[in-house]
């Protein structure tokens, strides 16, 4: 499809994003019969105008910027992918580990895989996660206190951070609302959530980020950590194309669950 002006083409890009979650550079070059450089320039100009959000390899609608969604809603999204990720993460946990689980639906899937394991110590600020871990015997469980939020059924705030800083953790299972591979950032939906996550990172020897492919086509408000500063990011096969395009130094951080 050929458009006579840049303005017409960019207007059509914005229109397409109303119906599609993500527009890749390749999709734009084919649809509009333009070069990669022109497609990138269009997206950059529309990003500057606040009409879309530029992401690695394309763009998302500004309405795709993440906010907290209820756990019940998020639990059904990409369920198979989250279960596959959880299986890989469970294999990284060894007897005697102290494991801190960040509240979230992917970490909840990890808890389900670990609930019957013995000789482990668990800490979590997620109510659903703590409830899941009470299944089975032969382990220790610590529930983080603080201000309760019903949205993701978690405890957060200064009291939660103070409690977390009392521990020495072997492995942290950290959720991500989004991952910006262009800037090398792991993000979450609010400054409050980010502050709790940073407290978790401070006390943990190894940080294991869990994120399905949908987290790579979104944008979030608050930075939790840099990709280079975490141990590993476990994701699903839907991110293979994105991972192949990033620098090798960061690519080594990713483990793909099949």
Swiss-Prot record:
The keyword Lipid metabolism does not apply. This is Transcriptional repressor AccR. The lineage of its organism: Bacteria, Pseudomonadati, Pseudomonadota, Alphaproteobacteria, Hyphomicrobiales. It holds the Pfam family HTH_DeoR. Keywords: DNA-binding, Plasmid, Repressor, Transcription, Transcription regulation. Residues 23-42 bind DNA. The keyword Transcription applies. SMART domains: DeoRC, HTH_DEOR. The gene is accR. Represses opine catabolism and conjugal transfer of the nopaline Ti plasmid pTiC58. InterPro entries: Carb_Metab_HTH_regulators (IPR050313), DeoR-like_C (IPR014036), DeoR_HTH (IPR001034), NagB/RpiA_transferase-like (IPR037171), Tscrpt_reg_HTH_DeoR_CS (IPR018356), WH-like_DNA-bd_sf (IPR036388), WH_DNA-bd_sf (IPR036390). Residues 6-61 form the HTH deoR-type domain. GO terms for molecular function: DNA binding; DNA-binding transcription factor activity. It comes from the Bacteria.
């Amino acid at each position: 499809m050929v458009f006579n002006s840049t303005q017409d083409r960019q207007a059509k890009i914005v229109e397409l994003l109303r119906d599609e979650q993500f527009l890749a550079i390749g999709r734009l070059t084919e649809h509009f019969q333009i070069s990669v450089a022109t497609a990138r320039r269009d997206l950059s100009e529309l990003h500057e105008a606040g009409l879309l959000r530029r992401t690695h390899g394309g763009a998302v609608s500004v309405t795709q910027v993440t906010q907290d969604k209820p756990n019940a809603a998020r639990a059904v999204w990409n369920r198979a992918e989250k279960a596959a990720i959880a299986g890989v993460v469970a294999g990284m946990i060894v007897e005697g580990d102290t494991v801190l689980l960040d509240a979230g639906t992917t970490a909840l899937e990890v808890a389900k895989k670990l609930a019957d394991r013995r000789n482990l110590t668990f800490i979590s600020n997620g109510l659903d996660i703590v409830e899941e871990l009470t299944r089975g015997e032969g382990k220790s469980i610590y529930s983080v206190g603080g201000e309760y939020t019903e949205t993701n059924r978690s405890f957060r705030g200064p009291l939660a951070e103070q409690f977390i800083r009392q521990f020495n953790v072997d492995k942290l299972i950290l959720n991500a609302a989004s991952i910006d591979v262009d800037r090398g950032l792991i993000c979450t939906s609010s400054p409050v959530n980010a502050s709790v996550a940073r407290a978790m990172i401070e006390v943990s020897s190894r940080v294991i980020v869990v994120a399905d492919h949908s987290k790579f086509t979104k944008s979030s408000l608050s930075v939790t950590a840099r990709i280079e500063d975490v141990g590993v990011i476990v994701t699903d096969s839907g991110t293979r194309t994105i991972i192949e395009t990033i620098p090798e130094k960061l690519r080594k951080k990713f483990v793909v669950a099949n």
